[in-house]
Structures are given as C-alpha cells and as structure tokens.
Amino acid sequence: VLKVTPRVHVSKIELLDVEAPGDFKWHGGQLAPNGFIYGVPCYASQVLRIDPRTDTVSYFGDLGHNKAKWYGGILGPDGNMYCMPFAATRVLRVVTAEDRCELIGPELDGGGAHGGYKYHGGLLGPDNCVYGFPMNAKTVLRVNCITGDVCELPLPEDEPFNGGKYKWGGGCVANGCVYGVPSDSCRVLKIDCRRGTVSLFGRLPAQKNKFQGGVLGGDGGIWCVPCDAAYACRIDPVTDDVAIVGTLPSQHDKYQGGYADA
C-alpha cells in the first residue's frame, strides 16, 4: 500500500506491508464511515483494509484466486462498498461495519474473454442504486443498496465499433441521471434513474480509448477527459447535446480522470 502525506513543500511516501505478493491485487477502493479504507479485490483473494490512523493493513474474506474479479467499488448510502463484477459472476458487497464480504444477486453472463470483462466501475445514483458501466456487457448493472436486489438494464441497441468492447469508462451524475463517458463507444450512455431506462445519444468518431472519466464542470456540463482522443468533449445534461472541444496532441494515453475545482 502506498501512503502519501502531503505537505507544503515535501511529500512523505511509504509502502505498508511490502511483502504482500502478487500483481494487480486491488482495483479501486473507498473510505467507509468507520474511518477505514477498503480495497476492491481484483487478483487478490481478500478484501484490503487500511487503518489510516495506525498505518496498519489487514485482509479478510476468502474469494479465490481467479484473475480480474472486480473492478471498482462504490460506497452505498448504507455504508457498504459494492464491487462491480469484471470477470467475477456476482456483485461483491463489503459490509464495512462488520469487516466481512458477501456475494449478492444472480449469476451474471457477459461477452468477451475471461468471464466477460463485464462492468468497469460505476456510480451511486440519486435513487440509492449503484449503476455499473458496461465494458463488454450488453446491459447496465443496477444494485439497489436498500433491498440488495441486483438486476440488469438492457442497452437499447448494440454499439458495433470494436465489437462492442470497452464501451464506457467513468461517468457523472447530473439532472437526475447517470451518464457514461464514451471510451470505445461512439455514443454517450444515459441512465434515467427515475424511469429506470437506458438510452444512447450523440455521435462521436469511431476511435478506441477516446476518453477515460469525466467531471461535472461549473458550467453544468460534463467534461470528458481525453485519453487517446485529440480533443475534449462536453456533454450537456439538460439538452443531451454532445460537442467536441479544442485540439490536442494525437499521442495515446494522455490523461485518465480529472477533477473540477469548485
């Protein structure tokens, strides 16, 4: 675990529990209401727990040694972390108040290699449901944090570019909806949380890995962070207009994720 302690001119960086073996062990995490940080098991067989007050690291759960199990965890209104199934076939719920984890919902199918590479991260909607962004899956994943119900919302149509893989990466909540930022998809994903519907809109160039993540700007627009795209993109959540903005260098892997200063 990497710890960074920001200071005015100096940052202290240290590794905790450096002997833990393996690669790609955890992918994402959350600070829970109890003050502990929980890591999402990707290749790791256990959930990671960090106590930032004592700099101690511990693990719990017995989740097996399969690869790429879960990508990204979202903190629900119940204080639990919901992990999105990548190659795993079920949602993992980390019950932070008890330091235990459990699989919830039905077995999920998915297209693609190694169990599907189904969902990559997600967001908590205004309806207390977590929505998982489809990577290779043909559905949006919805987890009701209050009832524990897990269901799939089908996409209205296929996204044919690149075989329907790596469709959306990251997103934002705005105007009562969850918006998915196009990665290989040529259209924006829109989940209307009140109606429980999924739609696609806009038309962007057919290019792989266009954007990675998005932020809600002070102008009310969702700004997509350019990864391989040579431009930024602005989504208007009121009108559903999609605009290409600016000109950037054409090299790959420029940026991933961003932050909007309030």
Language model region names:
Residues 1-19:
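An edge-strand/N-cap motif at the start of beta-rich repeat modules
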Residues 5-9, 51-55, 95-99, 144-148, ...:
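Short loop/turn segments that connect beta-strands within beta-propeller blades
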Residues 36-39, 81-83, 130-132, 178-180, ...:
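Conserved beta-propeller blade signature
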Residues 23-30, 67-74, 113-123, 161-173, ...:
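Repeated scaffold domains used in trafficking and secretory/extracellular systems
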Residues 2, 46-48, 90-92, 139-141, ...:
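A short loop-to-beta-strand structural motif that recurs across blades of beta-propeller domains
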Residues 12-18, 58-62, 102-108, 151-157, ...:
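Beta-propeller fold detector
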Residues 42, 86, 135, 183, ...:
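Short loop/turn segments immediately following the C-termini of beta-strands
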